[in-house]
Amino acid sequence: AELYGQVKAGRNLPEYLSAKAREFMQAVAPAQMAGLKKRCDDLNIFILTPDSADYPQRLRDLPDLPLVLYGTGNPACLNGRRYVGMVGTRRPTKYGLSACRDLSLTMAERGVVIVSGLAEGLDGAGHRAAVEAGQQTVAFLGTAINKTFPAVNVTLRTELEALGGAVLSEYPPDYTGKMTGTFLARNRLIAGLSEALCVAEARTRSGTLNTVSHAEEYGRPVFAVPGSIYSPTSEGTNELLRTGRARALCTADDVLDTLHIAPGGTELVQEGVMLDELTPNARTVLASWSASSASSASSGPSCRLFWAAPW
């Protein structure tokens, strides 16, 4: 509404508003804007633009950032946390489901916000693992914000919102326009919010690999779970590994260590020493100490670790 007012008043607009967006906003009648705002208020839907305080900071830097995001749940979870994307096929095997669930659960328990698309299959499995851990998770839809697709995930959506997570969409409530390409378009948002993207299981031709392409464009590291050479649903992940587009994902620590994430989703650092300057052995010692100190913090006095690092 603020941006709309600026357009009508003829004031200068932020650079991120393209000419096409300006033209659209100038053509929209004030009554339409007011009606949309009321509809969102009635459905407890929040609206974010790049000028909003809760707009995801990680999306602001994208060349194709969304001008408007509609959301339900808790917008406060969209900033100030550690975010990892978990995606994969909508028709997973038991192996893929188990890998997705175990990896997502471990990362969520470490304070990571799992990001995915609330779709059937591994998207839902990633969100469900975060809910199981009692942690926040963020979902991006390719539909109107007040429509859950598939409908089987309606309960999951309610549960993740109750835990302080959020569901976002570029499409307003009751949107009935063409859906061609909307799910592919939302893939860039999953990749954009994520600090790293994990692929649990995927075929060679799938929307999952579209998300991987966006992650590569945005400079996000990609991880893939190795699969059986006899499984069609692992052909995509194995190809990512074979061509060097992804790193092997065998344990959650493969991602957590790369992102320097300690228990609680905090940055893994040692006073006076940058992590990038430590040897692998030093990182292992520091990670182990961080984990043990976090688990014992509530059971008694703690001590701070100081050493003259020879590495």
Pin down the residues of each PLM region:
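Short, small/acidic-rich helices and loops at N termini and domain boundaries
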Residues: 1-53, 301
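Glycine-biased, small-residue-rich flexible motifs in mid-sequence functional cores and linkers
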Residues: 41-43, 47-311
